[in-house]
Regions:
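Short, mixed-charge low-complexity intrinsically disordered segments
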Residues: 34-48
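Short aromatic-glycine-(Arg/Gly/Cys) micro-motifs in beta-strand/loop hairpins
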Residues: 1-15
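Preference for short coil/turn "hinge" residues that link or interrupt alpha-helices
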Residues: 13, 32-35
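Low-complexity, intrinsically disordered Gly/Pro/Thr-rich segments
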Residues: 24-32
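A short, exposed loop/beta-hairpin motif centered on an aromatic-Gly-Thr core
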Residues: 13-23
Length: 48
């Protein structure tokens, strides 16, 4: 597993970020989407 930083915009227009462990960028995005109900868009997923 790798560590990914996911930056996203919430439905209220605020920017936020969170990291998680995942096997791929798409898996990291899915994990963050499951944890945050208020995501409007994913802005960046990068391995850290």
């Amino acid at each position: 597993m790798k560590k990914y930083l996911v930056r996203f915009t919430t439905k209220s227009g605020e920017y936020d970020k969170e990291w998680c462990h995942a096997n791929s960028e798409s898996e990291a995005e899915e994990i963050i989407r499951q944890d945050h109900w208020n995501i409007k868009s994913i802005d960046l997923v990068e391995e850290i």
